[in-house]
Amino acid sequence: MLQMMKVVAAIAIAVLVSGRATAQGVVMQRNLSLGMAKTIAEATIAECKSKGFHTAAAVVDRAGQVLVILRDEQATPQVAEMARRKAYTARMFRTSTMEFQKRTATDPAVAAQRDLADILALSGGMPIKVGDDTIGGVGSAGSNLEQDDACAKAGIAKVADLLK
């Protein structure tokens, strides 16, 4: 009987110790607020509108989930979806969609990444970063490709002081 109690006690101790060793703590992460996302999207559209383009802008959070999609009243409907996919691509790959487009066009080892769901390899998407931490993405669609990039950058620039 004493032997059995020792075995049970040993098992109980092992379970308790192993449970503590594998327990996970709370994970703290930075994320975009809805207010900041709206500011970025509005500044993105305003920049393109000032150049005569009718565009859409989308902002996604660190998980790639949409926070904001805005479409100029004169923009065509498909540009909102394009903006969302550009924002998602920039967030997921932590780089501009222009760089993603170049990399996947020249490297056969990663070319298949273009075929993943919701990925769009066209310029106009920018990651939103705090230091090296990518906390979201912004996408602009509806102008020419160079201008879409500039508009997305302008959106991020509007909140640059808050991203430090």
Residue ranges of predicted features:
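N-terminal secretory signal peptides that target proteins for export/translocation
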Residues: 1-4
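Bacterial N-terminal signal peptides
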Residues: 6-20
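Flexible, solvent-exposed loop/hinge segments and secondary-structure transition points
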Residues: 23-164
